[in-house]
Swiss-Prot record:
It comes from the Eukaryota. Participates in the inductive signaling pathway downstream of let-60 Ras and the RAF/MAP kinase cascade to regulate specification and differentiation of many cell types. Positively regulates the fate of vulval precursor cells. Required for induction of the P12 and excretory duct cell fates. In males, it is also required for proper formation of spicules. Does not function in the signaling pathway that promotes exit from pachytene. Keywords: Cytoplasm, Developmental protein, Differentiation, Nucleus. This is Protein lin-25. Residues 600-613 have a biased composition (Acidic residues). Residues 600-706 are annotated as: Disordered. Residues 614-627, 652-662, 679-703 have a biased composition (Basic and acidic residues). The gene is lin-25. It is found in: Nucleus; Cytoplasm. GO terms for biological process: cell fate specification; defense response to Gram-positive bacterium; vulval development. One of its GO terms (cellular component) is cytoplasm.
Length: 1142
């Protein structure tokens, strides 16, 4: 715009459109006020809104309105209230008003102090612009911090001139000093639930503290101090310091808080580590105990007492018969319990003290408490094991607690034992060991294993192999127990497996020497496998994970085929018919190759020979007098016809009988009527009926080749050759050439399966009468023929053990049992001349459990319903070596475990079998269902902690499956729609949440342990991974991948549910889970899990329901040094003050 004045052109600044619109708005508003028409938003027709001015800038309008409202010494109440109305109407924002206040340029201190009243009003409107973009959180601090600086500088400026303050107060006739309103605004700002934490969470918190201290000092320097203002400023400073302090979240779940002092989980770890995971070192066991102690908040003396309590319970149970489960019918954990009590237990306690969580005073208190409360248990154990068990453990712990603390305890126990008649002889047994007791054998075994520590491997191997020919198997088992407790069993197993392989193949040694070495190593390794059914055969022969280096060893192949164990579930994918046919062809080729390798050159497939076993021949030739009389009555002609039929068609008769056995229809009993020439059709009627029914049966489809057939094929011989070999054995002669140095011992073992089939046929009473006396004589001759290689008898027992169950198999097993027992006892009068007697005793001890299951009746578990009465009977179910427990046995095992203060290893064995067969879902669903239906807080809490301890039964499978099952059941997307679902019962959910949180904590701790323990982890780019087998060389890497995947999926699932924005029972479950994790005891597992769970989850909870989360909960998941976490925390605080829920 240009104005001409006497040939001069003056340029006047042109007003831009936003400014002009703002001035027009103010002018229109002023006119309305002057006309007594103050804007009222309840009447839209009279309202003057900024939105009616399209060119208007809200910030510029706000600046003008604030200046008009606070103009000089006059405060226009209409304009001030209009500003507040615009903020409530959201036509203006709180940050626009605050920026207008702090940017106001004025020399009048009074007017600036009056502006602080507007700051006080605006603090309640502070809110984030949008929750969707975390960067909007930065705009809050960019306004709040300058506002704080504006207030403190104004206070300091006012306090700097006390005379000026007095002048202002007189001039404006105010009751309060000029700093009153700035101080009130500062108080409101610091005490606000959003602004106060904002000023404390950034780096500016130190600057805020410094400014407040300066204000406090300025107040203290006033000549006329204002006590009320000084006190208010002190409260402001104290509040800010509280905001800066890290808050600790405390969570006490309803219903279970009263029972936190009772924790059976530590006691449950003892039988697990003693009997099922005894290969772990004492330090690893102590680390696991420590993490359980941290999670469960168990005191130090309780830990020591619980460990002693469980260990002595284990010793006592191994000495007694259980109801329906006597010692002879169950797996023997005797040496595992002995090794743990006397060797592992003191070491675990020492490691716990070295970790710093358990003190020497705690150990002393725990020992004293055990002496007071467990006296009867120690008495029972001492009498059974012939040793002063408490005194022995006390001696081991004396360097830890000191002699001053140990001597009174030792004196009390020793005096008590001397005054008790049954314990008098054992009072000094801790110092003077009784010979041939378990503790004596254990200490001798420790000394022998020390040779391995000093590198004297061959000396130890020779001493260990001599125990196979020793008089007592207990020494062997003691050494074996020490080896596995020291983590050296795999090393020893690999060494002997290599010796077995070298002895198998021709070498410079003579055949007799090779057979002797092979026999001893085979027996030694077999006993290890039998005594530790959970030990992987591949790990034993290989010395650790990785590709099997001696896969061609006949011991490895035979054991993979014929060591009876719980089968692992087949996880292979379904194959097409072409793939199956290719696999069958490959399996045949593998058999041909292995036959050629061991020196068997003949056709594998051949028709079965129609030659009757010798036992049957002898029976037919000899017969009985009764049969002869019957034959005479029938007539010579009829007898000749029957004999002719027997001679002409033995094969047809045999095939007919086999068809009758395998027919799906029940076989009819043979007709007992005599055949006469007048009625010949009646004799042939059953055979004709069978021949008519048999062709209707569909031929069975060829089965898929097993893993053993494809990966460790065994050589085999023909039936004809097996019959010839068996005939030699029955005559008491070995069937192999004793002077053939080029013989491969694998060819000897290849004959056993075919010979086993022939022996079972000979004992088939359904086809012919078995002469037990002749059968036992033949078996005795077989044992005599195997004197130079007794391990073949063990192989024969193993084959019979794995054969299909039948009466013939049972009868054969009884024959073998009687012959073996006769062999062991027959030489008792001439032991000096029988050099092989100790080895046969070793064999009897090794095969005793197999023979027992084959010959004796399996203990019948009573078929009763699970009622309170039946549970009170304390029935411990029994499982055979390859049995997969059903739900009934698992249920009774659960009742049995719940009634104890720990968990029996015989009950845990059922879980071990279920885990090996991947039947995790069965027992997990069953046991959690029992917990949820309990209804009693104390019982439910103990049961949850008991299941938590059971997670250590398996490597990681149980942890992963338990977590997945609970997530799928309680945190599924479908469950959100079931508001009245019974699974969300409040008390039951408290127990379930406790288990969920503990499972996640132990998972995170295990993951960290896998990553950091051992050599540096090599990262593999797994897209998916199956559960690794023990022999898998990438087992560690796959477990890390699976655990990470499990935890990440859980976090993603929580996000997915919460982002639906619906308040439901599932969200309530997530709230309780997040609170339970945040409120758990401070430990490494919690710190790791907290880092994995992003604070965004807590924000989502507050967004759905602001009342379900507080600031302390958010702080528990936030890292103060992480800016993203700080932004999330600001959004969380903004969500808490939302006026309504979207």
């Amino acid at each position: 715009m240009h104005i001409a004045v006497d040939n001069l052109t003056i340029s006047v600044p042109k007003i831009d459109k936003p400014t002009k619109a703002a001035l027009d708005y103010v002018e229109l508003l002023r006119e309305s006020f002057s006309a007594k028409k103050r804007q009222k938003f309840s009447k839209a027709s009279l309202a003057i809104r900024p939105s009616d001015f399209p060119d208007l800038s809200n910030q510029q309008l706000c600046d003008i309105l604030v200046r008009v409202a606070y103009n000089g010494s006059h405060i226009d109440e209409d304009f001030r209230k209009h500003v507040l109305d615009l903020v409530e109407d959201q036509s203006l924002t709180w940050n626009q008003v605050l920026l207008s206040v702090i940017r106001t340029q004025s020399d009048q201190l009074y007017m600036k102090s009056q502006l602080c009243e507007l700051i006080t009003e605006m603090i309640r409107f502070v809110q984030i612009k949008s929750f969707h973009d975390p960067k909007h959180a930065d705009s809050l601090i960019s306004v709040i911090l300058p506002t704080f600086v504006f207030l403190t500088k104004l206070i300091l400026e006012l306090l700097s001139d006390e005379d000026e303050m007095e002048t202002i107060q007189i001039e404006y006739e105010t009751k309060f000093p000029p700093y009153h309103k700035p101080l009130q605004a500062l108080n409101t700002l610091i005490h606000d639930n959003l602004c106060g934490p904002l000023l404390a969470m950034y780096r500016s918190s130190e600057e805020v503290t410094r400014q407040l201290v300066l204000c406090s000092e300025a107040f203290s320097k006033l000549e006329r101090p204002d006590e009320s203002s000084v006190g208010l400023l002190d409260l402001i400073l104290e509040k800010h310091q509280d905001n800066c302090k890290p808050t600790k979240y405390e969570y006490t779940p309803d219903g279970l808080a009263a029972y936190d002092l009772k924790n059976p989980s530590v006691r449950i770890l003892v039988p697990i580590f003693a009997c099922f995971r005894c290969h772990e070192t004492s330090k690893q066991m102590a680390e696991t105990v420590q993490i359980f102690v941290d999670i469960m908040r168990v005191s130090g003396d309780d830990v020591v007492f619980d460990l002693l309590h469980a260990a002595i319970l284990l010793k006592c149970e191994e000495s007694n018969n259980l109801l329906h489960l006597s010692k002879q019918h169950r797996l023997d954990f005797r040496w595992q319990s002995t090794t743990f009590f006397y060797k592992k237990l003191p070491q675990i306690i020492e490691h716990l003290v070295s970790f710093g969580k358990v003190t020497a005073e705690d150990v002393q208190k725990g020992m004293e408490r055990a002496l007071n409360d467990l006296t009867m248990l120690f008495d029972v154990a001492d009498i059974s094991w012939q040793n002063a068990s408490f005194l022995t453990v006390l001696n081991a712990l004396e360097p830890l607690i000191g002699s001053e603390a140990a001597n009174p305890l030792r004196h009390r126990r020793r005096e008590y034992m001397r005054k008790t008649a049954s314990l008098t002889a054992l009072a000094d047994s801790d110092e003077k060991l009784i010979e041939n007791t378990d503790i004596d054998r254990l200490l001798n075994a420790v000394k022998q294993v020390m040779n391995l520590q000093f590198g004297q491997n061959e000396e130890f191997y020779q001493e260990f192999i001599r125990k196979v020919n020793g008089d007592d198997c207990e020494d062997f088992d003691a050494v074996m127990s020490i080896l596995i407790s020291e983590g050296r069993l795999l090393e020893v197993g690999k060494a002997f497996a290599m010796k077995s392989k070298l002895a198998q193949y021709p070498s410079e040694l003579s055949l007799d020497e090779r057979i002797k070495k092979f026999d001893e190593t085979f027996l030694l390794l077999t006993r290890i496998i039998v005594k530790f059914p959970g030990l992987s055969i591949g790990l034993l022969v290989n010395g650790g994970p990785g590709e099997i280096s001696i896969a061609d060893s006949i011991f490895y192949r035979w054991s993979m085929w014929y060591v009876k164990r719980v089968p692992r579930k087949d996880k292979s994918e379904e194959k097409s018919e072409e793939e199956l046919e290719a696999m069958r062809i490959q399996a045949k080729v593998l058999i041909e190759e292995i036959n050629k390798e061991v020196g068997i050159e003949e056709e594998i497939e051949e028709e079965e020979e129609d030659i009757e076993p010798e036992v049957v021949k002898e029976m037919k030739e000899s017969g009985t007098e009764k049969e002869k009389e019957e034959e005479e009555e029938d007539g010579n002609k009829e007898t000749k016809n029957e004999t002719a039929n027997d001679e002409e068609m033995p094969g047809d008769e045999q095939k007919t009988e086999e068809k009758m056995d395998t027919s799906e229809t029940p076989a009819e009993p043979p007709i007992q009527q005599q055949s006469t020439p007048e009625d010949p059709p009646k004799v042939e009627e059953p055979a004709e009926r069978i021949n008519q029914e048999k062709p209707e049966e569909k031929p069975k489809e060829p089965l898929e080749p097993t893993w053993n057939e494809m990966n460790c094929a065994l050589p085999r011989i023909s039936r004809k050759k097996a019959r010839r070999y068996l005939g030699l054995l029955k005559q008491g002669n070995p069937f192999w050439s004793t002077d053939n140095n080029s013989l491969n011992i694998g060819a000897i073992l290849a004959a056993l399966p075919s010979m086993g089939k022939l022996l079972i046929e000979e004992h088939n009473e359904e086809k012919h009468r078995v002469d037990r006396k002749s059968a036992e004589e033949h078996m005795a001759n077989i044992i005599h023929a195997l004197e130079s290689m007794p391990c073949l008898f063990v192989c024969l027992v193993q084959w019979v053990d794995c054969a299909p169950a039948s009466p013939a198999r049972t009868l054969l097993a009884k024959t073998m049992k009687n012959a073996l027992e006769k062999r062991v006892s027959s030489s008792s009068a001439s032991i000096a001349d029988d050099t092989n007697l100790p080895k046969w005793r070793f064999i009897l001890s090794t095969c005793n459990e197999m023979i027992h299951e084959l010959t004796d009746r399996v203990p019948v578990f009573p078929d009763i319903t699970c009622t309170a009465f039946s549970a009170a009977r304390r029935l411990c179910p029994f499982v055979t070596r390859d049995e997969i427990p059903d739900s009934t046995k698992l249920k009774h095992a659960w009742y049995y475990m719940c009634q104890q203060s720990w968990t029996s290893p015989h009950a845990l064995r059922l879980l071990e079998h279920a885990n090996i067969h991947s039947e995790y879902n069965t027992w997990i669903h069953l046991y959690i269902t029992k917990i949820v239906g309990g209804g009693c807080g104390e019982i439910m809490k103990d049961q949850v902690d008991m299941i938590f301890g059971m997670l250590m039964m398996d490597d990681l499978n149980v942890i992963i499956r338990m977590h997945e099952i609970m997530m799928d059941f309680w945190l599924s997307e479908e469950a959100g729609n079931l508001q009245l679902d019974g699974r969300f019962d409040p008390l039951s959910m408290t127990a379930v949440i406790r288990l969920m949180a503990n499972v996640m904590l132990i998972s995170e701790w295990t993951l960290d342990r896998l990553i950091n323990d051992g050599p540096p982890l090599v990262e593999f780019d797994f897209t998916s991974a199956m559960t690794p087998e023990p022999e898998d060389p990438l087992r560690r890497e796959k477990w890390v991948f699976l655990l990470r995947q499990m935890l990440d999926r859980t976090v993603n699932r929580l996000f997915k549910i919460l982002r639906q924005g619906v308040l439901c029972t599932v969200v309530n479950t997530i709230v309780r889970l997040i609170k339970a994790i945040a409120g758990s005891a401070d430990c490494k597992a919690k710190r790791l899990l907290i880092k994995r769970i992003p604070p965004e989850i807590v924000f989502q909870l507050a967004y759905i329901e602001p009342q379900c989360a507080d600031y302390a909960l958010m702080n528990a998941y936030c890292d103060p040094k992480n800016e993203e976490h700080t932004r999330t925390k600001i959004r969380f605080l903004c969500a808490l003050r939302r006026s309504h829920i979207l």
